[in-house]
Amino acid sequence: MPRFANVVTIEIAPGHRDQVVTALAAHKARVKDEPDTLQFEVLLPKDDDTKVLSFEMYRDAAAFEAHLNGPSLAKLREEIAGIVMKLHGVRCVVVD
């Protein structure tokens, strides 16, 4: 099965980027314990402080689904509730 990736753009309320970055950094540390989460990166656009991106890679689509229903993502959602204006993910198959 091909690896699976998700590229997420998170639009946040002005003035809350540091809070979102802190929450994402904690989430990144927690997902290291998810055996089929291969990579999780937080990206900061240079020219837009109302957006944060994440790049996520999983063993396969089933691993991504497990991540979506896992405790770390539930905690992240709680931590950033009310300050995320819009969230857009692009689900991808990784070409080897």
Region spans (language model):
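Glycine-rich beta-strand-turn "strand-cap" elements at beta-sheet edges
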Residues: 2, 9, 41-50, 75-96
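N-terminal first-folded block
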Residues: 3-34, 38-41
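Acidic/polar helix N-cap motif
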Residues: 13-16, 48, 60
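Intrinsically disordered, low-complexity acidic/polar segments
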Residues: 17-19, 51, 63
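Terminal low-complexity, poorly structured segments
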Residues: 20, 49, 69-72
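An amphipathic, aromatic/His-enriched active-site/gating alpha helix that lines ligand/cofactor pockets
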Residues: 26-39, 57-90
